[in-house]
Amino acid sequence: MAEKTDPTKEPRAVAVNVLKGGFGKSTTAINLARELADRNGRVLLVDLDDNGHTTFNLGYRDQYESDNHVQQVLLDDADPLENVVQVTDNLDLFPSHEDLEEVETNLKSAMASSQRLGRNIVDPLLGDTYSYIVVDTPANRGKLNDNALFATKNLIVPLRPESGWESGITQTNKRLIQEARQYFDLELLALVPTDLSERLDQDTRDRNLLYAINSRDELASFVPNFAHLSAADWEAIDAGDYTGDLPGIRHRASIDKAHRARKPLRDYDAECDQLGCYEELAQIVENGGVVR
């Protein structure tokens, strides 16, 4: 497959992060990375989440349970390229490992402990080897999360319409974004409503999530176009006159089935109507933010 690298695009790394589990981080990271690979040159997906969902969902359980390659690369300076596996023609994976808690502990006593991912993976590989690097992060604070934010300096936050989504974004902002910004520039690229399925003309969790992020000035500019709703759109929804696409990444059986098939969505169901959302996420990473 020919690489579709655009020399005008700036290589960029991005972390997919929210301080709450079960909010679609792995699904978002996998399909964002796959769309970046489809649109550009080579892309690296790094799984730093100790639960290993990204690694499992792409079929690399053996690497998760083998020698601790994450320890070897981040702390012992092993060659990261010797520990990546190929997912598709242009997409590689640096898998997670079952002993990431040990890596977390050892990082606490290491020199430059928050710079290891940047120094050993992102900085040497971004640009020359990979056009983009996507990092799936843990759902809790710690050195691995610090490494992901410091190395990428760009953040995408997925949100599911479940109880606790608001505390998830509040804690992510307070305990990750604002704290990190005391030490380095960290850009929030997008807030991504995902796995939506309910009606919007009734008092549902989907509606509450979409209304909150679209109506708050401090959040609205980070909402992708596929989830953006104007005041006029809400009036049309309540009047039963809305004719636009349903906003957000919608729940689709093929997304879940792709995980069970150990494939990104594009490689499992190239006709899925939600691929356009992941493609826009890729454009947001390419552009460095949402463009209305």
Regions found by a protein language model. Give the residues of each.
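P-loop NTP-binding core
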Residues: 1-292
